[in-house]
Amino acid sequence: MKKIELLAMLGESKDIIDYLQRKGTVQVEKCDAPESMYYTDTDSSVSQLERLLQTAENARETISFYSPEKKKLTDSFLPRKEVELSDFYEESEKTDVAMAKCREIIDIKKEIADKKADIIREQTAREALIPWERLDIPPNTTGTRHTEVFVGSLPDECTEEALKAGFAAALPDLTALDCEVVSSSNTQSIIVVICLKKDSRRVYDYLRSLNFVRASGGDNENIKAAMERHGKNIEALSSDIDGDEEKIRELSSYREDIDFLIDFLTIRKDKYEAFKKMSLSRNVFYFEGYIPERYCEKTVKGLE
């Protein structure tokens, strides 16, 4: 490796840095700034480019996931395609469009994630209703003009026979009472108890002694209708996701433009990082670095 020092007019800095980047032979190192020269802070520009680069790479990964590129096994061993300088400048004019497509892809990806989360919520809500499936009245039913209806759950397994026997023992004078166990497991039993209005306080007190929890209020919708609603919501969300995934597959036509955008942003980021290591004055710029010896002569001639 040979050490290289370069002092040139500030107005030529862009062309010189572009040339060195294309050649990729010089490693710029930060050095002590000569007297009357200073360093410029490019951190904000680098950070902005890193965010843009992250967006582009995220979009590229999303395209690859939903629309994998068909390649031969040997393609990974081939060198990257070289781009003529004129073509590079022409393609660089399209980077704004490519970035807009990247943002569109990311937005669609977020919508897919949100809808998948909604599906999980709908499935959870539907599964929570399964123990109540045989209930043929809305869970928030409280009664009629003359009767009180208690719909809710007990914390343990319970049979209808045991429930009726418990009422008979605790409230033997009650004759106008009916109860049903809708479902029962070792963790929960769903029950319905119907009694006369005048007996409702005594019935409720007994149920509370069993740790009865009344069904919470809500829409006047029966369980079957609610389960069907959740099922339809899941189908609609799944259909929307299929449509969103197809949109991403259609946007895979911008794959090459996004690949170029990633390279373009990487070059710009590297340029600003290199520029941060260069000393500037009002009219000139200066930097030090290292270059492989075999490239010295050719690089110097190119710079001259």
Residue spans of the language-model regions?
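Long, charged N-terminal accessory/stalk domains
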Residues: M1-E304
